[in-house]
């Protein structure tokens, strides 16, 4: 039996359902704050899942409009019920259905590394961001592994090279220590998250990097 195609993987059993039911909002907000000011901006939650970032951008950040885009239907349906004031769009991150220079702020939290064509996805991110606009991308360190069918991983230096090659200025770099250790009750996953948290005490081994990008 062949492996499921990426969209089939997410549609058949949306494995982030626990994120919809028990979101780690402080973790998302820590990243969103790197894009402040959000008030009055047009905001895109790229690879949104159920769109908690779009919700926070609107309700806490004061964004004028927030769009949540994902290529799987199920998370969009879940998110639409929770945050009806956001715009919900089903689309592909490598061919974004938006005009050039549409958004002031973009968040891609754990999404661009799953694009089938990373350079094309970054070119699209650059295209839809306004001049002077900012994006925060949260991407995995070189050793991180998940069960998702497509996943690009790199060191911090490699990520910096890739992002600059796409035309972005790097305005800041931070780290993300990953999901809460007791996010769920699966013993193996708890042990893995505990190990990741310990590894993250060593700066080069932080779980994920947070790059704040600016379009010149």
Which sequence ranges carry the predicted segments?
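Conserved beta-strand signature within the Rossmann-like core of class I S-adenosyl-L-methionine
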Residues: 133-139
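Class I SAM-dependent methyltransferase SAM/SAH-binding core
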Residues: 50-95
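Acceptor-substrate binding/catalytic loop of class I
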Residues: 143-158
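A C-terminal cap/extension of S-adenosyl-L-methionine-dependent methyltransferases
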Residues: 136, 157, 161, 171-216
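A short glycine-rich, Lys/Arg-flanked "PGG" loop and its adjoining helix->strand segment in the class I
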Residues: 119-131
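A conserved beta-strand element that flanks and buttresses the S-adenosyl-L-methionine
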Residues: 107
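Conserved class I S-adenosyl-L-methionine
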Residues: 1-36, 41-49, 195
């Amino acid at each position: 039996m062949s492996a499921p195609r990426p969209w089939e993987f997410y549609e058949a059993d949306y494995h982030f359902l626990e994120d919809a039911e028990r979101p780690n909002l402080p973790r998302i907000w820590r990243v969103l704050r790197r894009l402040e000011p959000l008030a009055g901006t047009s905001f895109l939650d790229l690879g949104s899942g159920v769109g908690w970032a779009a919700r926070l951008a609107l309700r806490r950040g004061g964004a004028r409009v927030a769009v949540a885009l994902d290529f799987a239907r199920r998370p969009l349906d879940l998110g639409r019920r929770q945050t009806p004031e956001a715009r919900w769009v089903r689309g592909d991150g490598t061919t974004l259905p938006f005009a050039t220079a549409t958004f002031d702020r973009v968040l891609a939290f754990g999404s661009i590394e799953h694009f089938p064509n990373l350079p094309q996805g970054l070119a699209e991110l650059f295209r839809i961001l306004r001049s002077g606009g900012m994006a925060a991308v949260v991407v995995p360190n070189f050793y991180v592994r998940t069960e998702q069918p497509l996943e690009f991983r790199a060191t911090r230096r490699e990520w910096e090279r890739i992002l600059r090659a796409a035309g972005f200025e790097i305005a800041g770099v931070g780290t993300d220590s990953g999901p809460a250790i007791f996010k769920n009750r699966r013993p193996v996953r708890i042990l893995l998250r505990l190990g990741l948290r310990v590894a993250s005490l060593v700066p080069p081994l932080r779980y994920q990097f947070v790059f704040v990008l600016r379009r010149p």
